[in-house]
Amino acid sequence: MKVGFIGLGIMGKPMCRNLMKAGYEAVVYNRSKASVEELAAEGAQAAGSPAEVAENCQVIITMLPNSPQVREVCLGENGIASAAKEGTIVIDMSSIDPVQSKEIGAELNKKGIDLMDAPVSGGEPKAIDGTISVMVGGSKENFDKYYDLLMAMAGSVVYVGELGSGNVAKLANQVIVALNIAAVSEALTLAVKNDADPELVYKAIRGGLAGSTVLDAKAPMMMAHNFKPGFRIELHIKDLNNALNAGHAVNAALPLTSQVMEIMQSLKADGNEKDDHSAIVKYYEKISDTSVEKEN
């Protein structure tokens, strides 16, 4: 099967590479040409625009930064809709506002193009080894039809519901992760301010109800002051903003999300937006006049 892939960034490039390893023919487009040239050298067909991808493929995956980019690639000049044949399927794996997913899907549908939203979780390491989690919204018929395609890039692929539901699930994930990281930061700050060893506190609580994937992934980074990004603060701000917009659209109260969003905005103002989101602890260190960093 020939598959179009638009958006070859940190996540998109390894995901596309995994499709190629699974035997799919890839037609690729990216605004920056270096990634296109890299995958073309590995056997992909290079395209000069989203429209050219659509001319060559009836299955197209997009992996883009946010809603405006998805809208432009799908509906803009030289976009997918300008050249796609009726019956084309677009699988948008970007993390965007679910309201936007529905609006873009409705416009594509007028031209006989189906849209599925299929955002992912797991970050670059899981994109590389093909174990990302995929949350899918759209028709169940399309989910069943393209399940194997998605599994070529993933460790799990779950159908959530109608179009937009995939992004609702992703935003729920991002809310939980953000609030958990803030809670870990707060707890380690409490420990240090009470003269307790934060590493021993971490070891004491990780086997109980407070134990979590977030605790195990982020507490060691905080104590090492290693903020090399697995997921940057600026990207989490984008996701929380989308979550708040989605919540406001349906009158869902998200007070804790709003609070953590303000913490992240404060960190951005201090120049930390490129740091891993575990750098939320810097906010707590600053206002508490302390550090959770362990001495070597």
Roles of regions detected by a PLM:
Residues M1-M63, T88, M93:
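NAD(P)+-binding Rossmann beta1-loop-alpha1 motif at the extreme N-terminus of oxidoreductases
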Residues A26, A46, L115-M116, V157, ...:
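Hydrophobic beta-strand scaffold residues
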Residues S32, N66, S139:
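Residues in the short beta-alpha loop(s) of Rossmann-like NAD(P)-binding domains
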Residues P50-D114:
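Rossmann-fold NAD(P) dinucleotide-binding segment
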Residues S95-Q174:
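Rossmann-fold dinucleotide-binding core
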Residues D129-G137, V158, L163-N194, K203-A217, ...:
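Active-site-proximal catalytic alpha-helix in oxidoreductases
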Residues L163, N167, G211-H277, N296:
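Interdomain hinge/lid region at the active-site interface
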